[in-house]
Amino acid sequence: MRKPDSKIVLLGDMNVGKTSLLQRYMERRFPDTVSTVGGAFYLKQWRSYNISIWDTAGREQFHGLGSMYCRGAAAIILTYDVNHRQSLVELEDRFLGLTDTASKDCLFAIVGNKVDLTEEGALAGQEKEECSPNMDAGDRVSPRAPKQVQLEDAVALYKKILKYKMLDEQDVPAAEQMCFETSAKTGYNVDLLFETLFDLVVPMILQQRAERPSHTVDISSHKPPKRTRSGCCA
């Protein structure tokens, strides 16, 4: 297996849908409830580069492993459930500190999952289904509760992270570009999330390669040793 050129890590509390997001993107399916033990990863080829995507466990007993998985990460996806405000709070309280081992120019995406369970998500789904002439009245999407976390809350957290990392907003992608609402169940915005990050990570790969010291020897500047009268090299 070829060594990954870069690494992306998903962090977040248990049951926010990290594994489902990753499997929706990589396997194009929505899995039954699966709890990740420790960590698991996929390898994604993007253009000519290999990017590893790590899924981490949200359970408290595996919390310490997150720092290990984040080591050297080029991007971190901080995931919460739009229906549970505490899951957003946990990102700052429990998970942000784990990112200290990531690369110094690490990118952060704030992702609110399970938007399909909200009032807005239900209405969007209902509009699509009403286009079907075979849809019975009893099959309509039932009303859902309003979101507990708004996109503006995610933007506020993103700006807090920049302060925590002592980063200037002008030197990083805008909050509006890095805050997403997704549904692993329907696939809403899942491709957009991952592919936005891939496109942002590729220039970082190129920069790292350019900064690596060259191991090539310039033989054109190499001069042969001078010989002494005894015939030995000086």
Curated annotation (Swiss-Prot):
Q: Where does GTP bind?
A: G17, K18, T19, D32, T36, G58, N113, K114, D116, A184, K185
Q: Pfam families per the record?
A: Ras
Give the source species. Answer: Homo sapiens (Human)
**What is its membrane topology?**
Lipid-anchor
List the biased-composition ranges (Basic residues).
223-234
Function as written in the Swiss-Prot or TrEMBL entry: The small GTPases Rab are key regulators of intracellular membrane trafficking, from the formation of transport vesicles to their fusion with membranes. Rabs cycle between an inactive GDP-bound form and an active GTP-bound form that is able to recruit to membranes different sets of downstream effectors directly responsible for vesicle formation, movement, tethering and fusion. RAB20 plays a role in apical endocytosis/recycling. Plays a role in the maturation and acidification of phagosomes that engulf pathogens, such as S.aureus and M.tuberculosis.
- Protein's name in the database: Ras-related protein Rab-20
Cite the SUPFAM superfamilies for this sequence.
P-loop containing nucleoside triphosphate hydrolases (SSF52540)
Covalent lipid adducts (S-geranylgeranyl cysteine), residues:
C232, C233
Keyword Repeat annotated: no
Q: Where is this motif: Switch 2?
A: 55-72
Q: Does the keyword Cytoplasm apply?
A: no
Which taxonomic lineage is given here?
Eukaryota, Metazoa, Chordata, Craniata, Vertebrata
Q: Cross-referenced Gene3D superfamilies, in alphabetical order?
A: P-loop containing nucleotide triphosphate hydrolases (3.40.50.300)
Q: Recite the UniProt keywords alphabetically.
A: Cytoplasmic vesicle, Golgi apparatus, GTP-binding, Hydrolase, Lipoprotein, Magnesium, Membrane, Metal-binding, Nucleotide-binding, Prenylation, Protein transport, Transport
Its activity is regulated as follows: Regulated by guanine nucleotide exchange factors (GEFs) which promote the exchange of bound GDP for free GTP. Regulated by GTPase activating proteins (GAPs) which increase the GTP hydrolysis activity. Inhibited by GDP dissociation inhibitors (GDIs).
Q: Which domain of life is it from?
A: Eukaryota
Q: Where is this motif: Switch 1?
A: 28-41
Give the InterPro entries listed for this entry: P-loop_NTPase, Rab20, Small_GTP-bd, Small_GTPase
Q: Which residues cross the membrane?
A: none
Q: What is known of its domains?
A: Switch 1, switch 2 and the interswitch regions are characteristic of Rab GTPases and mediate the interactions with Rab downstream effectors. The switch regions undergo conformational changes upon nucleotide binding which drive interaction with specific sets of effector proteins, with most effectors only binding to GTP-bound Rab.
Enumerate the catalysed reactions: GTP + H2O = GDP + phosphate + H(+)
Tissue expression profile of the protein: Low or absent expression in normal pancreas and stronger expression in 15 of 18 exocrine pancreatic adenocarcinomas (at protein level).
GO BP terms: namely: cellular response to type II interferon; endocytosis; intracellular protein transport; phagosome acidification; phagosome-lysosome fusion
Q: Which residues bind Mg(2+)?
A: T19, T36, D55
Reported cofactor(s):
Mg(2+)
What family, per the record?
Belongs to the small GTPase superfamily. Rab family.
- Catalytic activity, EC: 3.6.5.2
